[in-house]
Amino acid sequence: MEVEKSKYRSEDLDVVEEEADLKKSRRDRDRSNERKKDKGSEKRREKDRRKKRVKSSDSEDDYDRDDDEEREKRKEKERERRRRDKDRVKRRSERRKSSDSEDDVEEEDERDKRRVNEKERGHREHERDRGKDRKRDREREERKDKEREREKDRERREREREEREKERVKERERREREDGERDRREREKERGSRRNRERERSREVGNEESDDDVKRDLKRRRKEGGERKEKEREKSVGRSSRHEDSPKRKSVEDNGEKKEKKTREEELEDEQKKLDEEVEKRRRRVQEWQELKRKKEEAESESKGDADGNEPKAGKAWTLEGESDDEEGHPEEKSETEMDVDEETKPENDGDAKMVDLENETAATVSESGGDGAVDEEEIDPLDAFMNTMVLPEVEKFCNGAPPPAVNDGTLDSKMNGKESGDRPKKGFNKALGRIIQGEDSDSDYSEPKNDDDPSLDEDDEEFMKRVKKTKAEKLSLVDHSKIEYEPFRKNFYIEVKDISRMTQEEVNTYRKELELKVHGKDVPRPIKFWHQTGLTSKILDTMKKLNYEKPMPIQTQALPIIMSGRDCIGVAKTGSGKTLGFVLPMLRHIKDQPPVEAGDGPIGLVMAPTRELVQQIHSDIRKFSKPLGIRCVPVYGGSGVAQQISELKRGTEIVVCTPGRMIDILCTSSGKITNLRRVTFLVMDEADRMFDMGFEPQITRIIQNIRPERQTVLFSATFPRQVETLARKVLNKPVEIQVGGRSVVNKDITQLVEVRPESDRFLRLLELLGEWSEKGKILVFVQSQEKCDALYRDMIKSSYPCLSLHGGKDQTDRESTISDFKNDVCNLLIATSVAARGLDVKELELVVNFDAPNHYEDYVHRVGRTGRAGRKGCAVTFISEDDAKYAPDLVKALELSEQPVPDDLKALADGFMVKVKQGIEQAHGTGYGGSGFKFNEEEEEVRKAAKKAQAKEYGFEEDKSDSEDENDVVRKAGGGEISQQQATFAQIAAIAAAAKAAAAAPVSAPVTANQLLANGGGLAAMPGVLPVTVPTLPSEGAGRAAAMVAAMNLQHNLAKIQADAMPEHYEAELEINDFPQNARWKVTHKETLGPISEWTGAAITTRGQFYPTGRIPGPGERKLYLFIEGPSEKSVKHAKAELKRVLEDITNQAMSSLPGGASGRYSVL
């Protein structure tokens, strides 16, 4: 049973195995079929993709799209495969449960793994093949692109070749035109030379002789024409014989020669006709002129009864008005004075000699009177004949120094008949002499002047300095607007919207109170609320959206309607309140309404600012809006390259942002050809109070006087003192004043701290502040002077704090790069003077430190206003010491007006200073806005003269009795018999001392009485420049002492007289050159200039004194740089001084006419 059971069991196992094998074979077959199907479908899809790629080979995006689709399909297949694998695993597990053979399961697993590996390998190979195909496709595309580029390059080269060919053709045509034009000009020149020769010949002969000359000239011209034709015929025959081997070429050249021959013959005929007509016209004019001259002279001789009023001689030279043109293009008319000079320079027997030569037609040589008969008449050049006749004799006479001979009265103009005949040639000779002296053939540039009464010799030095050294305001000439017709322009562009017009007056007042607006004026427009209510263009509104300008600021809400209405305006607002945008937007609308600016036109809008940094700031703000509108803006300020500014101004610009000094330089350069102010209708003065305070009032006034009166003028500033407002209202027409907040108030968003600290503790406190604030943002430190700025900069570098420095002594490029680095976060710490207190708008400036207290209230407002701008918060710390107590009241005022707490120590310091002021111990500190610049008025001139006299008196110089301003103005006699007051006093003192010594040894019985002593004393007192000495009457026993005193005085007087007689007489003068430009000082102190002047005048010139910059005063016993002139005569010294003044004036005018490239500072970039 057990055997049978095992047998059955084995049979069952075999059946099971067979069934498993059948199942496996079926499964393998199914899998192979699926693989084949997958491969077929994969191949079909690959073929489809390739077809699609071939069709869309020009687009790389299609490839990417196909790749994305293929990737999605692969992912889907991968999911399906995983699902099938999971099912397979389930089935296998089920089979494993049902099957007892674990070996079969393992083999199945091994087969499945192999299948999976093969599938993955095939997949990788497939991916590799696809990558290769994609790479080949890309390479194919790149080759196609390269082919297209080559095709484009080939086409471009073809176009360039065609253009070069066209250029060659044009160049060839241009050369041909130039050759033709050159030939034409040569023909015209030859024709003009012939005409001139004919004119000169006709001038030398009379009426009858001119006809004979014309006939002979015509014969000669015909003969020359015939010879020229014969030569041309021979040339053409020779040319045709040389080219017989080419009949075609020969025929072409023959045709060309015939055409040329015809044209030349026609030209000769036309020329001959013109000459005939000209000769006939001249002949008629000669007859009319001679007849008119004869009648005039007869009438004059009869009226005056002169015996010399005879007929003019037949051979007299003639001058005809309208016939003096020549090849250089001189005007045709000749004045009567020139005609007279030509007649006067001719010898008296000129006409007779010519008649003899023409009748005989031969002569041995050309006579001095101008004969033409040296050779045959046809071979004489008329120009040579004229030179030999007229010019050479005069040159010989001039060289010999002989006066010209007297001329007949018949050759004189009617205006000269009242004078003697002997004076007329002398006057004409002097005119010719003047022309020859000014020529280039003179041996020296310094010829002995003939006129001793030259006003420049006696010119006062003060007048010379005023005439040569004009101020910038004086260089710009005034304009008479009544003589200029200006084009009308529109100023009112504002239309009030309904939302604003519906507001009641109470609502308007409430709205202004909310904005802290105060308005003064008549019919003031209501303030706006949004940008679209201004009436600006859509481009400007779009630009403001891009710049995130959401809502107008208080000054803008009121300034925009006022300025857009065409009213003049004064705007006073705190720092950082948007004043710049308040005048920029209306100016752009004003400019767009006017005709476009062309090259050579001046600007329409002119913006003036006091500092270069503020000019750059305004220019950058305007550029944000002007670029989209197509409006050009040019900054004009000193210290930068002027060439670029001039080129941009010449091309034309609508807006100029400038400093007043450089603008006047530009307007005066090249006589005003660079730009002008004729089209300026919108004038802006930003920080106007500072410009008036810095002394720009004369320049600003002169610029405003050159602008049309009906302009629109706008003034803006953060501070506006009353005295400056009075000056500003002179240039405004019924202005409207806008005031935001207080008149000069610090922004309330700024936290102000004032610390009373001595000088020694400030640096450590500054380092503490830097440690606290350096992480938060930028820091600006203000100091009082340039030296303090450099010293603090060095200390900060030593303390390992990277920082920048900025002050007016630096070069302009350094200043610009420093501000740029500070704004662009290159360095977050800047040490500056008050030059950065205005116009510097830096984002993220969190802290301002006044290391030195500002010297007036307005400067404090502007310094602190560099932070807390455009609604942001800021902080300002100010250091003050007891030595700066005079500035404490200004700080207390600033804190109280801006509602900030006042420290107790600061209040005590201010109160103590005011107590001293009331007691008269201290003097109150001013605002600094009284106008520190020059007034250029008579009062200031009188103050200057008084100070000069006081200084001269302090140094021991006494004024002359003639109320002269300067001792150097007069040429004085040196070392003569005069004795100065100081020397005379010293002589008296020495004489008295000698008398005292001699008194002891003198005998009592000296024969000198008191009366003699008084007489001698009186004579001594009468000496010029000697102080009178009172000599007391001496008793009889002191007669010896008195005699000794008189003897000593006589000895001193005799010695001085002997010394004066021994010294040669000479004169001296002084010329101060300290205040002239550097190149002028160098020129007049160089030996190349002083040597010729000394040789010419005989005066010795030496340089004395020391150069002192502007503002520095020489110390006691020192003098500014001057020239000391000594000479043997007063005339030589005067001439030397006049020549030095002339050199100084020339160099100074050159320096002022050429615009400076920029003021060189103390520092420059190496």
From Swiss-Prot:
| Residue ranges, compositional bias (Basic and acidic residues) | 1-12, 21-45, 111-206, 224-314, 344-357, 416-426
Gene Ontology annotations for the cellular component aspect, listed alphabetically: nucleus
Motif range for Q motif? Answer: 529-557
- Which one of the record's GO molecular function terms can you name? ATP hydrolysis activity
Broad class of enzyme this protein falls into: hydrolase
Output the SMART domains linked to this UniProt entry: DEXDc, HELICc
The short sequence motif called DEAD box sits at: 686-689
Q: What is this protein called?
A: DEAD-box ATP-dependent RNA helicase 42
Phylogenetic lineage:
Eukaryota, Viridiplantae, Streptophyta, Embryophyta, Tracheophyta
